[in-house]
Amino acid sequence: IKVVVPRADTYEETVVSFLRRAIEVAQAQGQEAHIALTGGNTAEAVYRHWSTYPDQPKPPLAIYLSDERCVPTHHSGSNHGMVRRSLFSNSLPAGIRMVTPDVSDPRSAAREYDQRLPSTFDLLLFTLGVDGHFASLFPGELNSLVQSGRVAVTVGPPPFTGRVSLT
């Protein structure tokens, strides 16, 4: 589903509604919901908005990342760290888990992360960067991908050049 939000002032609320609904539908079938979240300033605003809900997000829930920079999770450039800080104030509630790549060795991380991904997601959230990048797939860089199944090692602009990305 492609969602176009006509008014910027309703963007966060609209996206949070989609996230909540996808999780509810999966959990109504008695299963853990599987969602992939993205990084970036736009997404961070959505997660901060979502964190204001008293019942935000409900377990059982597995959160994956559409892409991650090859930096430690406590680094300001880490998408994992950004999601934890903005959505959960750094503390994951019981029954919610983050499944993220170990980016210390990007090529191994891509293979290992691909094996940990579910066969299907209940929702994948992506935004488009001002330079046209999607996840960590950058225009003009597709020939340099080192792919392992559904995950690739990519090269982005400095300062975070190494990345692991869904494809």
Language model region names:
Residues 58-125:
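Ligand-binding beta-strand-loop-alpha-helix segment within the catalytic cores
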Residues 124-126, 130-167:
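Class I SAM-dependent methyltransferase SAM-binding "motif I" and its flanking Rossmann-like core
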Residues 49-58, 81-85, 139-148:
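A glycine- and small-aliphatic-rich helix-loop capping segment at beta-alpha/alpha-beta transitions
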Residues 1-35, 107:
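N-terminal glycine-/serine-/threonine-rich phosphate-binding loop
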Residues 37-42, 126-130:
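Glycine-rich beta-strand-to-loop/alpha-helix junction loops that act as flexible
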Residues 46-48, 75, 134-138:
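Short glycine-/acidic-enriched loop or helix-start segments at secondary-structure transitions
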Residues 34-38, 62-65:
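Short, conserved beta-strand segments within well-ordered enzyme catalytic domains
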Residues 16-27, 47, 51, 84-88, ...:
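Generic structural signal for well-ordered alpha-helical scaffold segments
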